[in-house]
């Protein structure tokens, strides 16, 4: 099979003159049908000649070389190696869903354009063609509920969405600020390269299949001009973490650790997975490349590659089945490209989500013209503590390792205060404070340990080795007694609200991985044995708080209005002016000092504002529009096929055990589904547009069955599967027999909530979960397939447990939603009772 595929690829390259990487993409997209691939290539040649704009990053800095045609383009990258993907089913497995999979030809053109304009890993010029905007999902509220839910489960990483929202880490700001948009994690391939896949999806809308970002990351770490400065920042933070666990490295060990970091970023596959029992379903006679899993330092380097800040939304602790926090999750926080001048960076951050050792891009949805919602990302948690600022300390070239580390004077000279951190955020990002309504209260995040109270100050993970306690100020002696009473009262209220919150984090993920992670964590987490928590901040306030609050409110009104106007979209540097009036003679700008004042007040429990970075959302480029339209057309065809299959299954169910009529169906989709031949793409897409309210509901996630769960590593300490190292990240895969991975595993949607104005604001909140049924990773026990448990009324299923009261087992559609034992008892009861309708009336 390999020789045949290589021969076909060689013939295609010789006959068309296309690059090997583009040729492989075209052939794989058409399942190695040469004629179909040639047709796509001709279409690409025509589109490339006249339709696409010369640059995909409109408005970004730096000059761009005009793009040449396919035939005369100079090779700017080495030919793509022949990977060990000898079966065409591998391509279906890797990207069996998503926008980029449905439009492989146009995505191949976009990838080729982006990579052809790429440069080296240095900082003298933009290493890659970087967009200044973020990718947005299309407006799904224009479609009816069934088709919308089909797209949602196809594009959105729903288990991650539910897990992070329940943990109070994601979208908590939407509940307190109705003008903010909800961010959604995009489904991302899990082949060890998910960090770069997520970054590529967040900017361009397609995966990093050509490893373009990974190669740029490796080049910057290996030979970039920032290499030594990056190494110093990494070593400083690692040294502070080692102090927590009592580790001391020799110079040889430091060099070995650094070389290992560079090696992890390599684009060479780590290993290949064949068919074995450890994988979910496996792929017959196929192998797929798996890449080394990356660490938080690689996120920091990626910020320099992209020349833009990166914000990672993640929980802070990994928990076992008992809810015990036993390992920190170090990825969450802010990564600034500090080795690149702020004036040369994009100010709109790239936002990623991290859960269960997997990265996804967080994106918003395209809005209607009359919608006033804004896309923002908070730079504090829900308790108004500033997110960790990773690798922010560079001790300098003159730092003597091993000597200055123990010199308190030298240490104090490099520790960052809260003012310095705020100055960096103001310099690299467009930030602002969003006022909250008087009755708004942010949901509480999960505590670092199940016994920690909400008001306890978590011990800081020594990211950058900095501390903010000095900058927050000491408590006023005159107000200390009263504040202690108020703090104690707030703590009791927060403890009460957190009672159920901790229980919600107990999950099946901890049950399966808890013991193995504990076993492996000792050796793998030795250098990361830091205490959990974010940036440590004192809770005291300076004297004269009331006067300070009045001044802050008066000055904020004028400052906020001017700031919103000044917060432009271009990469404008915010350098602090010298000695501004009214800032107490501070070397930082008045805006920074005002932010410091507001943040101090918020950390004392008087939060009136949210400190956020603004996300730039611009118009899509032509290739993105084409890519989305092709995906919607493909999704419609798959949706119609799925509906027909479900209808056939309903008929079989009703004819077999059937005790009642088929579920009621909406007339709109039925009229379309029964047509043997569909209308053209555009008219078919419009056929799904209805007058439904603008709610956007997320279906409950499911495990997808035991044989098709998505394996992921958890921090460098996952289970050893099939003799592999515990940090291995396995690709997500499902049995090839299933036409769609989601078909049999996603339950029906719960009705969404509506805002007063009828918009979809707030409707993305997941349905309510009972404590007994919800888990920390967002998974639930496998529910009935969509549309099977509607009963006589045709409603979506609202429960998955056995219909028999007080039964802890789960039912199945084949047994009328009883478990097997209760179903047998029910059959025996019905045999004894002449009236079979008692089954319907009783339950």
UniProtKB/Swiss-Prot annotation:
Basic and acidic residues: compositionally biased ranges: 65-77, 456-471, 488-500, 665-675
Molecular functions (GO terms): cysteine-type deubiquitinase activity; cysteine-type peptidase activity; DNA binding; K48-linked deubiquitinase activity; K63-linked polyubiquitin modification-dependent protein binding; zinc ion binding
GO BP term, pick one: negative regulation of interleukin-8 production
Positions carrying Phosphothreonine: 729
Positions marked as site (Stabilizes the conformation of the regulatory loop): 197
Post-translational modification: Phosphorylated by EGFR.
Positions of Zn(2+) binding: 802, 807, 819, 822
Motif Nuclear localization signal per record, residues: 483-498
Catalytic function, reaction form: Thiol-dependent hydrolysis of ester, thioester, amide, peptide and isopeptide bonds formed by the C-terminal Gly of ubiquitin (a 76-residue protein attached to proteins as an intracellular targeting signal)
Description of what induces expression: By TNF-alpha.
Expressed in which tissues: Widely expressed. Abundant in kidney, heart and fetal liver. Expressed differentially among B-cells at distinct developmental stages. Higher expression seen in primary immature B-cells as compared to the mature cells.
Residue segments, region Disordered: 50-88, 442-587, 652-711, 732-792
UniProt zinc finger (A20-type) residues: 796-831
Chief place of localization: cytoplasm
Cellular-component GO terms for this entry: cytoplasm; cytosol; nucleus
Region described as TRAF-binding: 152-401
Keywords from the named record: Adaptive immunity, Cytoplasm, Hydrolase, Immunity, Metal-binding, Nucleus, Phosphoprotein, Protease, Thiol protease, Ubl conjugation pathway, Zinc, Zinc-finger
Domains: entry comment: The protein undergoes a significant conformation change upon binding to ubiquitinated substrates. The loop that precedes the active site is in an autoinhibitory conformation in the apoprotein. Ubiquitin binding leads to a conformation change; the loop is stabilized in a catalytically competent conformation with the result that the active site Cys can form the reaction state intermediate.
UniProt subunit comment: Interacts with ZAP70 in activated T cells, but not in resting T cells. Interacts with TRAF3. Interacts with TRAF6. Interacts with PARK7, leading to inhibit deubiquitinase activity. Interacts with EGFR, ITCH and NEDD4.
Protein name: OTU domain-containing protein 7B
Organism (species): Homo sapiens
Phylogenetic classification of the source organism: Eukaryota, Metazoa, Chordata, Craniata, Vertebrata
């Amino acid at each position: 099979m390999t020789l045949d595929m290589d021969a076909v690829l060689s013939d295609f390259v010789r006959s068309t003159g296309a690059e090997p990487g583009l040729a492989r993409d075209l052939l794989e997209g058409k399942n190695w049908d040469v004629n179909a691939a040639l047709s796509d290539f001709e279409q690409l040649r025509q589109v490339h000649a006249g339709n696409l704009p010369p640059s995909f990053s409109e408005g970004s800095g730096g000059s761009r070389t005009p793009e040449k045609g396919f035939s005369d383009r100079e090779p700017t990258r080495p030919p793509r190696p022949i990977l060990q993907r000898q079966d065409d089913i591998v391509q279906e497995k890797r990207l069996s869903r998503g926008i980029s999979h449905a439009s492989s030809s146009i995505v191949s053109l976009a990838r080729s354009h982006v990579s052809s304009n790429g440069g080296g890993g240095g900082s003298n010029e933009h290493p890659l063609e970087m967009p200044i905007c973020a990718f947005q999902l299309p407006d799904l509220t224009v479609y009816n509920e069934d088709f919308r839910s089909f797209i949602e489960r196809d594009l959105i990483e729903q288990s991650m969405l539910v897990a992070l929202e329940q943990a109070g880490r994601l979208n908590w700001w939407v509940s307190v600020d109705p003008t903010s948009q909800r961010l959604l994690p995009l489904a991302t391939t899990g082949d060890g390269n998910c960090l770069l896949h997520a970054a590529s999806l967040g900017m361009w809308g397609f995966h990093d299949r050509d490893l373009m970002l990974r190669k740029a990351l490796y080049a910057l770490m290996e030979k970039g001009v920032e290499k030594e400065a990056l190494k110093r920042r990494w070593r400083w933070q690692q040294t502070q973490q080692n102090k927590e666990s009592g580790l001391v490295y020799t110079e040889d060990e430091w060099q070995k650790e650094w070389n290992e970091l560079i090696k992890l970023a390599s684009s060479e596959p780590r290993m290949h997975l064949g068919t074995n029992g450890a994988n979910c379903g496996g792929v017959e006679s196929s192998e797929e490349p798996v890449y080394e899993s990356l660490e938080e330092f690689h996120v920091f380097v990626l910020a320099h590659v992209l020349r833009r800040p990166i914000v990672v939304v993640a929980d802070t602790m990994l928990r076992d089945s008992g809810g015990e926090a036993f390992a920190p999750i170090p990825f969450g926080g802010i990564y600034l490209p500090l080795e690149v001048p702020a004036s040369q960076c994009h100010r709109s951050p790239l936002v990623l989500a991290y859960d269960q050792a997997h990265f996804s891009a967080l994106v918003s949805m395209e809005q209607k013209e009359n919608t006033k919602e804004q896309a923002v990302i908070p730079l504090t948690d829900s308790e108004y503590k500033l997110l960790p600022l990773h690798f922010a300390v560079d001790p300098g070239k003159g730092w003597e390792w091993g000597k200055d580390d123990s010199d308190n004077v030298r240490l104090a000279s490099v520790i960052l205060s809260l003012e310095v951190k705020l100055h960096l955020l103001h310099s690299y990002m467009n930030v602002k404070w969003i006022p909250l309504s008087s009755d708004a209260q942010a949901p509480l995040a999960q505590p670092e340990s199940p016994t920690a109270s909400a008001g306890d100050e978590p011990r800081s993970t020594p990211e950058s080795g900095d501390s903010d306690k000095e900058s927050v100020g000491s408590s006023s002696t005159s107000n200390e007694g009263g504040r202690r009473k108020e703090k104690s009262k707030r703590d009791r209220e927060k403890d009460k609200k957190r009672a159920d919150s901790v229980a919600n984090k107990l999950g099946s993920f901890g049950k399966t991985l808890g013991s193995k992670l504990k076993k492996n964590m000792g050796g793998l987490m030795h250098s990361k044995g830091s205490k959990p928590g974010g940036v440590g901040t004192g809770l005291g306030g300076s004297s004269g708080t009331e006067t300070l609050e009045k001044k802050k409110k008066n000055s904020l009104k004028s400052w906020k209005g001017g700031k919103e106007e000044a917060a432009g979209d271009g990469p404008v540097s915010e350098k602090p002016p010298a000695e501004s009036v009214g800032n107490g003679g501070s070397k930082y700008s008045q805006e920074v000092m005002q932010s410091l004042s507001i943040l101090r007040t918020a950390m004392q429990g008087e939060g009136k504002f949210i400190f956020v970075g603004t996300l730039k959302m611009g118009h899509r480029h032509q290739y993105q529009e084409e890519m989305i339209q092709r995906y919607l057309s493909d999704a419609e065809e798959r949706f119609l096929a799925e509906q027909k299959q479900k209808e056939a299954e309903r008929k079989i169910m009703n004819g077999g055990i059937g005790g009642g009529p088929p579920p009621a169906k909406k007339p709109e989709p039925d009229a379309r589904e029964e047509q043997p031949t569909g209308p053209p793409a555009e008219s078919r897409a419009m056929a799904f547009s209805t007058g439904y309210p603008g709610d956007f509901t997320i279906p409950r996630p499911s495990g997808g069955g035991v044989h098709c769960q998505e394996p992921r590593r958890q921090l460098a300490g996952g289970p050893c599967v099939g003799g592999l190292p515990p940090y291995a990240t396995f690709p997500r895969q499902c049995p090839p027999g299933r036409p769609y991975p989601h078909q049999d595993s996603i339950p029906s949607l719960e009705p969404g909530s509506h805002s007063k104005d009828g918009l979809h604001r707030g409707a993305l909140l997941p349905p309510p979960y009972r404590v007994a049924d919800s888990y920390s990773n967002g998974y639930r026990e496998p529910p009935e397939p969509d549309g099977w448990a509607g009963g006589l009324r045709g409603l979506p299923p609202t429960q998955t447990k056995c219909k028999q009261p007080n039964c802890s087992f789960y039912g199945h559609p084949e047994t009328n939603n009883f478990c097997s034992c209760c179903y047998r008892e029910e059959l025996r009861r019905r045999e004894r009772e002449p009236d079979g309708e008692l089954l319907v009336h009783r339950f």
